[in-house]
Amino acid sequence: MLTQDQLKLAVAKKALEFVPEDAIIGVGTGSTVNLFIEELAGIKGRIKGAVSSSEASTARLKAHHIQVFDLNEVEKLSVYIDGADEINHHLHMIKGGGAALTREKIVAGVADEFICIADEKKYVTMLGAFPLPIEVIPMARSYVARELVKLGGHPELRQGVTTDNGNVILDVHGLQIMKPVELEETINHIAGVVTCGLFARRRADVLLLGKQDGVEVLR
């Protein structure tokens, strides 16, 4: 039986098939993406470089001598490759376990195609078992938490974490997310919220799902 790490490695390798020649690609953040970066290093001569969604991924890319571009220098990205904490059958996701959700959402928004790489444990019928991360301006933390309670959630400050943008993360427990697009818009309209970890309005276009019998490609 394959371990979770072996499933992650399988999808990381499969993702190379979706990397166009001579392109600048978007690269996400997290344990599965770290494996993808290791694989990407083997074909780095085929690409121009990458736009990164976090300081951690930037450091890892640079360690492999892959050129990292500022997003403001890049007009478009053909593809963005990132993991997910949960993903449903409609390819809506919860992301932000690594606290990079805002930059991930920005880079994903620029890309023509979003490729999600995940193992089968992340594939769910309903989002919400994984606590929903919300990036919040620090002075608004208590207000935003009260508003999230009104939506039926139980927000908890992620201790000791400051995002790359200098903000805090509230992890919202206890949500059964029936309508991800609507909830994403509702939370994002709360004053003080930078963004929430629902990726439903900009969902994945392709899911590379690591399973015991191989990598399944879902669209």
From Swiss-Prot:
Its EC number is 5.3.1.6. One of its GO terms (molecular function) is ribose-5-phosphate isomerase activity. It comes from the Bacteria. One of its GO terms (biological process) is D-ribose metabolic process. The active site is at residue 104. One of its GO terms (cellular component) is cytosol. InterPro entries: NagB/RpiA_transferase-like, Ribose5P_isomerase_typA_subgr, Ribose5P_isomerase_type_A. The keyword Transcription regulation does not apply. Pfam families: Rib_5-P_isom_A. Substrate binds at residues 29-32, 82-85, 95-98, 122. Keywords: Isomerase. Pathway: Carbohydrate degradation; pentose phosphate pathway; D-ribose 5-phosphate from D-ribulose 5-phosphate (non-oxidative stage): step 1/1. It is an enzyme of class 5 (isomerase). It catalyses: aldehydo-D-ribose 5-phosphate = D-ribulose 5-phosphate. Catalyzes the reversible conversion of ribose-5-phosphate to ribulose 5-phosphate. PANTHER family: RIBOSE-5-PHOSPHATE ISOMERASE. Homodimer. Belongs to the ribose 5-phosphate isomerase family. This is Ribose-5-phosphate isomerase A. The gene is rpiA.
